[in-house]
């Protein structure tokens, strides 16, 4: 009788569990469908009712979407929210000739909406479509709120991203872990960095810079991360959470005196402590962190950890390197047996003199092949997979890096992006290439190169660049224009054919003032193309102005191209000033230096016409996170510091994240150049040799004062973008043309 009751209990209990699973799945499906409809409504608030959605299964384990017209509506089908959103974007681009980008959007849909006469189906050949770089979370996203994040997640879904890095909100998790290990909040103040420097703190490059970090910021980011992850997962994304790589607080030895630590330094910042992976507490801390992270955020079983980020290991001993990887992975797997380690392959490029075959194999082979995925971080330019036999059998992802420091310049490598993902996919030597992705340090710039890269998501063949660019211009501007087509042809073979610079050339305007044409440091002013060709494109886009002036995308492009032409021309003027100084021609020096200052002012006025180029937005968004005057001041200082000195007054990364923004030009760069010209002029009058080193020291003090200042910059655009660009063209075109000829 007992056995019969037990059997009844087991069967009935199983039925309850099974029915609960079905209900849970149905609820999840309902939530997913709701999330997709909400996305459509956010993107197309006036036309959302014209679209219907339905979920269908994968085909041969491949994500897919279908589009067709049913009863006068556009039916979007897909295996998850991402696929359906991608179907929507495909329809918008290819049927409605519309476009959604960070910098200019065209959603002027035809009325009535075009019908899809024959069902369209697209499958992605890539299991993973990765997005983001640790650096993006600071160079672009330091001050984002939930509204901005939601907009980005929509954009990710529309473009097929299914594997985003999600490292927001980890400091509160670390705080709880270290509190439980006996560290006080006061001790952690010297550990956690300020908000603009999280990336480099997380990767073990620095401690405490820009802090102390208020608890309110940690709590706010934890709440926001929950929203981010919920939205990403509802749409079908598998988010990558951070893991432990050994970076521990400065007072770690006080709590654990017998543990072995090594100290590393990075670009002049004070040493940080890295816990020896052989110490038993290494895996214990890593396990505790993952456990607390899962409790807080849930998991998709994907974890990011980067060992030796821009730091050389203390030894190339294979046993040591193997052991490091083993312990990092173990710390994940002890907390989550399903853990897969997502590793950025940046170290193999950045420190390629150290990372040879033996060393790379030692690091990678410690982890089972099915438990690690390597991000080939700069595939469009320096594909490490080609010199590592595709990471010796590890699954890996082809990525476009493109941008450094969210610098503002026209640059990219279109031919590589259009051809190489598909070529790698079909190359037997690529072995376990499982996806493609974007790993830029900063976004909200050069939208064309990202649109091009993401065109690869739903195709397995190279992109015909000439044809694609014509379609791009049509989508962007809303109508065909011959001059616009010619502009993009010129851009594709000049600024977007850059095989020389790393992330594009900077303008001499943003350099610390000097007579040198190319001051060096963290960037170059050397152009990888003939600037006269860009002037031709400038003339052509101005010729299209009357026809396309109402297009948001055109307004951005005409300002951006004008900006680049003027930024390039600044070097011509600066070098003439250098000649004037060498010739001791005081009159010419005054005339040309005045012209240089006017050029900066004109550039600032031009950029003030677009929200994309306002310093005020960056600073104001930072201050919005503050709950007290002290917090607002701290966040503003972080925001100012990152885009100027980067660290203290002597930091060699100064100007790494320079910005050609309205407000920065007049409020920072112009003032530096005015001080430079004033000092040189005084020296010329007194017949003295200009002392560059002394001037630099004076400038560092002024720059540090600017970092700590609080003057306000506008968040409101002023003037008409196209008219402003036309004025610049009228004023400078003939002069610039003559200078290059």
Which functions belong to the PLM regions below?
Residues 1-29:
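Bacterial Sec-dependent N-terminal signal peptides
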Residues 25-126:
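Contiguous, structured surface segment used for ligand recognition
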Residues 68-73, 133-137, 208-209, 553-557, ...:
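Acidic/histidine-rich, surface-exposed loop or edge segments in extracytoplasmic proteins
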Residues 99, 105-113, 132-136, 157, ...:
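Catalytic-core regions of glycoside hydrolase
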Residues 120-121, 144-147:
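Catalytic and substrate-binding clefts that recognize carbohydrates or anionic sugar/phosphate headgroups
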Residues 126-145, 156:
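Active-site-adjacent substrate/metal-binding segments within catalytic domains
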Residues 520-741:
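Histidine-centered catalytic/metal-binding microenvironments
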């Amino acid at each position: 009788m007992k056995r019969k009751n037990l059997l009844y209990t087991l069967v009935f209990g199983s039925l309850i569990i099974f029915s609960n699973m079905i209900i849970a799945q149905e609820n999840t499906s309902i939530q997913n469908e709701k999330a997709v409809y909400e996305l459509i409504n956010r993107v197309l608030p006036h036309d959302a009712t014209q679209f219907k959605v339905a979920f269908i299964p994968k085909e041969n384990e491949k994500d897919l979407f279908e589009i067709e017209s049913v009863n006068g509506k556009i039916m979007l089908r897909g295996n998850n929210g991402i696929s359906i959103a991608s179907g929507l974007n495909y329809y918008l681009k290819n049927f409605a000739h519309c476009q959604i980008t960070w910098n200019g959007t065209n959603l002027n849909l035809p009325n009535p909406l075009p019908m899809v006469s024959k069902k369209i189906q697209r499958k992605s050949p890539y299991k993973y479509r990765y997005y983001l770089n640790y650096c993006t979370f600071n160079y672009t996203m330091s001050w984002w709120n939930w509204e901005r994040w939601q907009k980005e997640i929509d954009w990710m879904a529309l473009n097929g991203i299914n594997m985003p890095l999600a490292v927001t909100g980890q400091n509160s998790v670390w705080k709880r872990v270290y509190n439980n290990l006996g560290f006080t909040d006061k001790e952690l103040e010297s550990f956690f960095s300020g908000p603009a420097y999280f990336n480099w703190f997380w990767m073990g490059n620095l401690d405490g810079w820009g802090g102390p970090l208020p608890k309110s910021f940690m709590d706010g980011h934890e709440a926001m991360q929950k929203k981010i992850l919920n939205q990403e997962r509802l749409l079908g994304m598998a988010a990558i959470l951070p893991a432990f790589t050994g970076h521990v607080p400065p007072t770690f030895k006080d709590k654990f005196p017998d543990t072995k630590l090594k100290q590393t330094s990075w670009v002049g910042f004070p040493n940080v402590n890295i816990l020896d992976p052989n110490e038993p507490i290494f895996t214990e801390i890593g396990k505790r962190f993952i456990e607390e992270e899962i409790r807080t955020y849930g998991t998709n079983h994907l974890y990011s950890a980067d060992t030796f980020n821009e730091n050389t290991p203390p030894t190339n001993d294979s046993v040591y390197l193997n052991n490091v990887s083993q312990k990092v992975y173990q710390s994940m797997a002890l907390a989550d047996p399903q853990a897969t380690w997502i590793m950025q392959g940046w170290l193999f490029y950045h420190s390629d003199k150290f990372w040879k075959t033996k060393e790379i194999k030692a690091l990678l082979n410690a982890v089972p092949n099915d438990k690690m995925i390597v991000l080939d971080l700069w595939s469009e330019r320096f594909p490490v997979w080609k010199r590592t036999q595709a990471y010796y059998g590890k699954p890996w992802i082809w990525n476009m890096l493109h941008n450094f420091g969210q610098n503002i310049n026209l640059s990219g490598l279109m031919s590589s992006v259009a051809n190489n993902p598909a070529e790698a996919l079909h190359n037997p030597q690529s072995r376990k290439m499982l996806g493609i992705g974007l790993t830029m340090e900063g976004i909200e710039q050069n939208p064309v190169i990202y649109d091009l890269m993401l065109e690869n998501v739903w195709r397995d063949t190279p992109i015909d660049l000439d044809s694609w660019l014509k379609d791009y211009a049509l989508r962007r501007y809303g109508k065909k224009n011959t001059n616009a087509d010619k502009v993009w042809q010129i851009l594709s073979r000049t600024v977007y054919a850059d095989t020389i610079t790393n992330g594009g050339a900077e303008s001499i305007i943003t350099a610390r003032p000097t007579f040198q044409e190319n001051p060096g440091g963290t960037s170059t002013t050397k152009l990888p193309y003939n600037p006269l060709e860009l002037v031709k494109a400038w003339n052509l886009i101005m010729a299209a102005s009357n026809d396309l002036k109402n297009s948001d995308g055109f307004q951005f492009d005409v300002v951006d191209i004008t900006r680049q032409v003027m930024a390039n021309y600044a070097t011509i003027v600066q070098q003439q000033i250098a000649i004037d100084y060498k010739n001791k021609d005081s009159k010419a020096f005054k005339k040309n230096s005045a012209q240089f200052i006017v050029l900066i002012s004109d550039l600032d006025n031009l950029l003030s016409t677009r929200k994309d180029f306002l310093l005020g937005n960056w600073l104001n968004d930072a201050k919005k996170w503050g709950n007290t005057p002290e917090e607002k001041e701290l966040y503003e200082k972080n925001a100012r510091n990152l885009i100027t000195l980067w660290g203290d007054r002597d930091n060699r990364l100064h100007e790494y994240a320079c910005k050609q923004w309205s407000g920065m030009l007049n409020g920072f760069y112009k003032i530096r150049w005015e001080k430079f010209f004033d000092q040189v002029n005084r020296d010329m009058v007194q017949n003295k040799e200009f002392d560059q080193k002394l001037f630099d020291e004076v400038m560092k003090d002024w720059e540090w004062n600017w970092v700590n200042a609080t003057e306000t910059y506008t968040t409101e655009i002023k003037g008409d973008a196209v008219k402003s660009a036309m004025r610049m063209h009228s004023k400078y075109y003939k002069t610039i043309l003559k200078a290059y000829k």
